[in-house]
Amino acid sequence: MSTRSLVALQVGDHFESIYVHFDGYLKGVGQSLLKYTTYEQVADLLEGGDRSSLDRDSCYGDSDVLRVHRDLDELLAESSVFDYVYVFMDGEWYYVTSNTPLLKLRGAC
């Protein structure tokens, strides 16, 4: 069973994101994302497109095109489709689930 997540980056006034199929929970993808601390690092992560997992250099499907969202509201509207949505903005990681508001991602979740 997979825990689906979306990983997004604020780029100016819009957001770009990729899909991560496995381990989307806080102790999986959430903890892995904490090692990406700069805009450049996150942009490099997203560059490869959708992935099976963050822990392995593996693509998911044939999509290397980033999803583009006009604003945070449009991005968060997709939160019901994914178990977790992770967002890097203003130098910090945040997350949301279908039943939580936008929360700051912290270590040792």
Predicted regions mapped to residue ranges:
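Short beta-strand scaffold segments in enzyme catalytic cores
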Residues: 4-9
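Short acidic-glycine loop/turn motifs at beta-strand connectors
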Residues: 10-14, 88-91
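A generic secondary-structure signal marking the coil-to-beta-strand transition
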Residues: 15-16, 84
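Short, solvent-exposed aromatic-acidic interface loops
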Residues: 17-28
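Low-complexity intrinsically disordered segments
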Residues: 34-109
